[in-house]
Amino acid sequence: MSAQTDGPYGPLIPMPELTPDALRAAVTRIAPSRVPALTQHLFEATTNAQQTQSLAPLRAFVHSWAVFVAIERHPERAARLRELERLVDAGEQDPAAAIAEIRGIRETAEAETGL
């Protein structure tokens, strides 16, 4: 895992390496309830990679879970994302601003992962 700090309220954990094992370890620490979903996704990605003889499903798995970890390791960022998703799902307001902020959160997370 690479070292990274954001001051006194920095990330819960450093950003892990972009490998299935490192991502699983990170998810176990920051969102243990999501480990079954990660395991299922990895199984499906591995099966699809074998069937299609392509690494694309495994790359998609790593991308998806790396972004998840990059968001969830920052509790304030994760809470804000969930709040924005609730606003969009509720459909009570124009979702444009919330969608733009969600996009920004995801782009920041992708940049942190190097993807």
PLM region descriptions:
Residues 1-6, 111-115:
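Structured catalytic/translocation cores of nucleotide/phosphate-coupled proteins
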Residues 12, 16, 31, 51, ...:
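Intrinsic-disorder-associated interaction segments
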Residues 18-23, 74, 90, 110-111:
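Intrinsic-disorder/low-complexity, polar/charged segments
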